């Protein structure tokens, strides 16, 4: 059983487990299946909008498919949520990603 299959089995047991859904998105991206990674992290964003790690990765995956408009929107939303939850490290990373987009 692959890591992705294991994670999917865990998610089937607990569909509200944000970390497992996040890890599935990362596994798809690791396989360069950015469409599935985006779909999975968008589902996570719908289910648990305050799961801050989602935003940096999701924005990056949008960049991988050359969708800078969505990447920027995701980074900005994540930055607001990170600041709201006082996650200064995530806020810093999201701001850096936004700045990098602006430099392009």
Each language-model region and where it sits:
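Conserved structural position within tetratricopeptide repeats
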Residues: 9-12, 43-46, 80
């Amino acid at each position: 059983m692959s890591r992705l299959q294991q994670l999917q089995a865990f998610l089937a047991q607990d569909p509200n487990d944000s970390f497992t859904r996040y890890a599935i998105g990362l596994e798809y991206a690791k396989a360069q299946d950015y469409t599935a990674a985006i779909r999975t992290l968008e589902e996570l964003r719908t289910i648990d909008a305050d799961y801050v790690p989602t935003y940096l990765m999701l924005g990056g995956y949008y960049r991988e498919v050359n969708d800078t408009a969505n990447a920027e929107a995701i980074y900005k939303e994540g930055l607001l949520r990170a600041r709201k939850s006082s996650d200064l490290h995530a806020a810093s990373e999201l701001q850096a990603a936004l700045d990098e987009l602006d430099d392009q």
